[in-house]
């Protein structure tokens, strides 16, 4: 099969997403990409969203982290930026640790909830971060 899978498969996935989450189904031709696992997906996503033409591209990763985050960032031409997650903060990513100058260069943020390997569940803090960005 082709890398993108068959049209019937992508249509089926798009329909399931719409039914499962009660949202408009994504466009199967441009917004659905079947993958063989998370590793392939994370690499493909970084290759898609990191703009190599922009200087100083950065990708934010939790630390400790799934090593694929780092490899995908580097392969996409970006510099990984690590946010330490530690016990005294409940293993939460401390978003305020990133200076505004770094945020301006961030092109991708890898987040896993529940976190691996910490088990931290991200709730409303991620929505607040997303809404604060241009």
Named regions from a protein language model:
Residues 1-15, 114:
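A structural motif shared across PLP-dependent enzymes of the aminotransferase-like
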Residues 4-8, 36-37, 64, 125:
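Short beta->alpha linker loops
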Residues 10-58:
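Phosphate-binding glycine-rich loop
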Residues 31, 79-81:
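Conserved beta-strand segments of alpha/beta enzyme cores
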Residues 36-40, 44-47, 61-79, 87:
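Substrate-binding/gating loop at the entrance of the active-site cleft, primarily
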Residues 85-134:
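Active-site phosphate-binding strand-loop segment of PLP-dependent enzymes
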């Amino acid at each position: 099969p082709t890398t993108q899978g068959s049209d019937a498969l992508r249509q089926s996935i798009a329909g399931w997403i719409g039914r499962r989450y009660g949202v408009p189904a994504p466009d199967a031709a441009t917004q659905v990409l079947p993958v063989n696992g998370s590793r392939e997906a994370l690499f493909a996503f970084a290759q898609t969203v990191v703009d190599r033409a922009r200087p100083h591209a950065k990708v934010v990763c939790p630390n400790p982290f799934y090593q694929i985050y780092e490899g995908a960032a580097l392969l996409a031409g970006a510099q990984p930026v690590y946010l330490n997650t530690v016990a005294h903060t409940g293993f939460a990513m401390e978003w305020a640790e990133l200076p505004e100058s770094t945020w301006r260069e961030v092109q991708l943020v890898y987040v896993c909830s529940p976190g691996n390997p910490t088990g931290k569940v991200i709730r409303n803090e991620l929505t607040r971060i997303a809404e604060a960005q241009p």
